Amino acid sequence: MCFTSQENLMKGLDESGLKVSLVNKDNPNLHKNAPWQHIEVSSSTTPGLKSSSLGRSMNRWLASHENYSNCVAIIDWRLIKYLHATLSNKSIPWILLDRSPPADKGLLAKLQWPVWKKSWRLVSKTSHSRGSVVSPSHGKFVQDFVSISDEKIFTLPAGVDLEKFTPNKKTGEINLIYHGRLDRHRGVLALPMLVSKARAKGIEVRLTLIGEGDCANQLRLIADSDESIAVYSQMPQDQLATHLQKATIGLLPMPNWNIWSISSPLKRGEYCASGLLIYGIDHDGHRFTDNKKGWMKLVPQHDFHDEAIKWFSSLAEDEIQKYSQQSRKYAEDNLSWQLSVDGLLSAIHELKS
């Protein structure tokens, strides 16, 4: 789980009156002033061994402590196989946290798929357990691979910090932004080409890219020769929020592949909370439940550039401001982390009842 999701869910659980303990490999200084208890355990830094090393360290810690019997464990899918026996022996109910099946390409992802399936089979066969998914389509995806009842699965969507991510007044300028992994398989290399094609049609746009990934250096080289493109390394949330405030349109270029079509991207909510219009590829992972929104335009992948140029050229300044307000309002009504926390609390109380 990314730190943003972890922090907001734990904060919500703490504010609800529950005692929260976090067991992971983080440096204790990261949680020095946090309201939850943090327990650091060791983990290997060798690729391919990180999860097994961390899982075994967590299991040793759990096996040696007796004062955690009256609790519910929330565990990432990569780790549950190392902890399942000890949790069962101690009669500790647990929730599987699945924020995404294996998302990387290559050998590592191939090795992770059997682990992911086994994790969900453990949910299916263990009486005092539930599994969380980020979207209904994610839940259906799980059921395509594992025989598991609807009652064992609940949706825990990504939320957004509405106080950290806030809008600024928009102008008529078209400032595009994408933040997240700058990986080739996420479609980000199509974004500089969008700037070039828009410019060829007489539309001035600027593009900001924030993150790291396997094509980050290639994107930086492109930006070096195009002053309308800026590439930044991954940054703290406060700095990210400032960049989002300056933008007009948030981009969702991830293609219509299984891994993206079942997702609930954090950036989508952060775009909305910042009052951005949204443009991206049309699939379930990018859509909201009600997809008919003037401030959000999703198109087939093969039309990504042409439809963007048509939309950008049609946007007047007053329309951008109106859509910005509607986008923020949607975030306030539908995307607060509290909604996710409430869903998690409900699952916890059901397991303890």
Features from the language model and the residues they span:
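Short His-centered aromatic/hydrophobic patch
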Residues: 74-80, 98-99
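Membrane-proximal helix-turn-helix segments that form the acceptor-binding/catalytic region
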Residues: 96, 102, 111-134, 145
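Conserved donor-binding/catalytic core segment of Leloir-type glycosyltransferases
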Residues: 132, 169-195, 208
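Carbohydrate-associated surface elements
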Residues: 137, 159
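Nucleotide-sugar-dependent
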Residues: 186, 238-243, 250-270, 279-290
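Nucleotide-activated donor-binding/catalytic signature segment of Leloir-type glycosyltransferases, i.e.
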Residues: 217-241
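A charged, aromatic-enriched C-terminal amphipathic alpha-helix characteristic of glycosyltransferases
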Residues: 303, 316-349
